[in-house]
């Protein structure tokens, strides 16, 4: 009890790490079957595992649906600010110290969120034992209006290469990539032609042989929009309905998509708005695709923000229709849509800890132990233990002169 009273955060974290190890998530889930694939896994770099508390936290901040991110960051900022203020006020510091202490936690959280968006770092890569090409069906460069500035074809290719992709379709918003631009020199990832058309309340990914289309003629109603699928087919291309638009805007009209000639559906998309896709609707779309022998795919939907993907595809050689593609997803991405946004401050850390591999879990426990020992044991004689040493270097207190001994002691 004394340890819990003195170090509640460390003890609580150790308990959570042990509890979540009882029923952990697999590293990957087949988004169609819901089971762990036996022929694919994630290869985690040494530095990723060594600094697992940072790596996993940045991943968890990346795999956030939009509504859950808003709830979690808001609540975490308020809790961290209140905690810092209470700790400082209990030590009878001045109001300036209380304010500064209240700001430390929120500032660190914001910096972590920014790091998740822009910081280059070690990331897991897919390793597949089965035949097939590891491919991404939906990714952007700075040619898209919402692409990260400076996010060139070379950077997009390098981003995919680090994570085990062998090929990716380049699908900028309403901008054709037809291989007329030279491929990045030395890139081992094959860049394939594609485009993402913005039409009536829907984004349509067209891949393969892509040509310009009169978008205005598909932008007034659903009935006119679905004609795009047959237009893409006549061009020799392949059409995929993108998330989250078909789920949010056309959920009751997906049958019309199929009748009009759609070739496939995204069932996992790493964009924050698309991560809220509920699993029951995903199963309905998978069932619809299977019954009509349509392709289902996962999409990083990368725009240059974030270092890591939540999904990979393995395209089977010689297969067609529904069995063309296998979709492997990080579990943390699949569970987002089944939980209300207000639960995110608690459920996101819980899901993150359940997602840890044994090597990552060992890294977490090691770091907790190191920090706990640093806080418990004094660094030199006469000095109190712990990170207080660092704190004293920042908030140096004035030294007090000991009172003179009593007169009787001098005699």
Where do the PLM segments sit?
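Alpha-helical scaffolding within the catalytic cores
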Residues: 178-180, 190-194, 245-254
């Amino acid at each position: 009890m004394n340890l819990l009273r003195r170090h509640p955060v460390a003890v609580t974290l150790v308990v959570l790490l042990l509890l979540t190890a009882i029923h952990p998530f697999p590293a990957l889930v087949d988004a169609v079957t819901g089971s762990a694939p036996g022929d694919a896994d994630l290869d985690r770099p040494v530095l990723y595992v060594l600094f697992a508390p940072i790596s996993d936290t940045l991943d968890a901040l990346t795999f956030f649906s939009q509504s859950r991110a808003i709830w979690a960051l808001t609540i975490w900022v308020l809790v961290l600010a209140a905690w810092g203020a209470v700790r400082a006020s209990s030590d009878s510091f001045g109001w300036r110290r209380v304010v500064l202490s209240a700001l430390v936690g929120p500032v660190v959280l914001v910096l972590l969120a920014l790091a998740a968006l822009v910081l280059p770092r070690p990331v897991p890569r897919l390793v597949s034992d089965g035949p097939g090409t590891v491919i991404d069906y939906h990714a952007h460069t700075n040619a898209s209006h919402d692409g990260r500035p400076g996010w060139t074809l070379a950077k997009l290719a390098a981003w995919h290469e680090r994570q085990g992709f062998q090929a990716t379709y380049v699908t900028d918003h309403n901008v054709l990539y037809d291989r007329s631009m030279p491929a990045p020199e030395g890139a081992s990832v094959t860049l394939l032609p594609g485009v993402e058309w913005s039409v009536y309340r829907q984004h349509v990914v067209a891949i393969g042989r892509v040509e310009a289309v009169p978008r205005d003629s598909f932008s007034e109603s659903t009935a006119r929009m679905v004609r795009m699928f047959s237009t893409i087919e006549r061009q020799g291309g392949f059409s995929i309905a993108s998330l989250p638009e078909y789920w949010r805007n056309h959920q009751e009209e997906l049958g019309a998509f199929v009748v009009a000639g759609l070739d496939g559906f995204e069932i996992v998309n790493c964009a924050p708005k698309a991560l809220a896709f509920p699993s029951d609707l995903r199963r309905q779309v998978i069932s619809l695709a299977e019954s009509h022998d349509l392709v289902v795919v996962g999409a990083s939907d990368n725009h240059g923000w974030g270092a890591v993907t939540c999904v990979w595809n393995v395209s089977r050689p010689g297969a067609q229709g529904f069995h063309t593609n296998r979709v492997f997803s990080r579990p943390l991405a699949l569970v987002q849509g089944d939980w209300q946004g207000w639960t995110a401050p608690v459920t996101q850390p819980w899901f993150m800890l359940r997602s840890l591999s044994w090597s990552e879990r060992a890294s977490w426990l090691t770091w907790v132990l190191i920090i706990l020992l640093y806080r418990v044991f004094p660094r030199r004689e006469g000095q109190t233990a712990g990170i207080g040493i660092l704190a004293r270097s920042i908030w140096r207190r004035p030294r007090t002169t000991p009172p003179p001994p009593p007169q009787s002691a001098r005699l």
